């Protein structure tokens, strides 16, 4: 999401440098990144994440998986709205048009904050999957019960929930995904709730200590800790900067020891 500019969900955010955003995407593929997360509502003044992806990477590499999201989203004025089940097809078609594709690899259903049952919305996406517009389905911001509800309707390949070093309330969902062979895709793995809102509290001493042991940044340790939680975890840290991208990718090579993990877990 950082591709489109600063304060991406704010109406007064600054658009990104188009050339740099395209360079980030192309460098990601060069580094072996084969999973990109996007959405039609990822935009800022003058910039659309889907359009940038289409320009930078089309025609797409055969092994590249592009995952998008539908459900509550923003209109062209930046206002947020819910979506009825019958409106999801329009959102899917918008993503298809912006990405320049005839199908979507993975579509996640975003759950509305006050939504208890996702059956009707997920069922609508399952119909679009049967129609060939979508290859695989996922869900986002769900509980274990809601995941179970979705699985009764159609296969689920991934769950995208908030999760990270200081944001661990979705541990039960992660474990449920691991048991079922479903990818768990955390967002805010680096940022966390405070950093995402723009605040920068001091990093915990244990995290800095582990970073020092590995000659890594605190952000890299946050990302490495998240990846160490389970083999089914896939990370989607956002960036609009090539150097930051390379730092994030390097974090995947960090191997935290049992002592490292114990120290970090004690800091929760």
Q: PLM ranges: what are they?
A:
Residues 12-20, 48, 52, 79-90, ...:
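Alpha-helix N-cap and loop-to-helix initiation/capping positions
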Residues 1-12, 67-80, 103, 108:
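N-terminal small/glycine-rich loop or linker at the start of catalytic domains
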Residues 14-28, 82-99, 143-148:
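Short, acidic/polar
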Residues 36, 104, 137:
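Glycine-centered flexible beta-alpha turn that most often forms the glycine-rich phosphate-binding loop
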Residues 29-30, 54-65, 96-100, 151-153, ...:
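Acidic (Asp/Glu)-rich catalytic clusters
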Residues 96-114:
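Active-site groove signature of glycoside hydrolases
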Residues 112-268:
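Beta/alpha (TIM)-barrel catalytic core signal, keyed to glycine-rich beta->alpha loops juxtaposed to Asp/Glu
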Residues 1-64, 191-193:
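N-terminal binding-site loop/beta-alpha segment at the start of enzyme catalytic domains
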């Amino acid at each position: 999401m950082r591709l489109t500019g600063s304060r991406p969900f704010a109406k007064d955010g600054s658009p990104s440098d188009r050339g740099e955003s395209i360079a980030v995407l192309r460098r990601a593929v060069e580094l072996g990144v084969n999973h990109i997360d996007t959405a039609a509502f990822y935009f800022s003044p003058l910039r659309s994440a889907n359009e940038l992806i289409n320009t930078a990477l089309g025609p797409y590499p055969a092994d590249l998986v592009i995952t998008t999201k539908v459900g509550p989203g923003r209109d062209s004025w930046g206002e947020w709205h819910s979506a009825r089940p019958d409106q999801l097809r329009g959102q899917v078609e918008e993503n298809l048009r912006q990405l320049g594709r005839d199908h979507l690899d993975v579509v996640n259903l975003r759950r509305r904050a006050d939504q208890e049952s996702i059956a009707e919305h997920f069922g609508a996406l399952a119909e679009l999957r049967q129609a060939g517009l979508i290859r695989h389905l996922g869900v986002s911001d769900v509980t274990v019960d809601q995941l179970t509800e979705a699985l009764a309707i159609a296969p689920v390949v991934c769950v995208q929930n908030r999760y990270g070093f200081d944001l661990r309330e979705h541990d039960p969902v992660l474990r449920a995904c691991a048991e079922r062979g479903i990818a768990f895709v955390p967002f805010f793995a680096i940022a966390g709730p405070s950093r995402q809102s723009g605040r920068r509290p001091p990093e915990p001493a244990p995290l800095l200590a582990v970073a020092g042991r590995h000659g890594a940044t605190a952000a890299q340790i946050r990302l490495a800790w998240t990846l160490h939680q389970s083999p089914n975890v896939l990370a989607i840290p956002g960036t609009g900067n090539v150097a930051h991208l390379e730092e994030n990718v390097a974090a995947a090579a960090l191997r935290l020891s049992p002592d490292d993990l114990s120290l970090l877990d004690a800091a929760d």
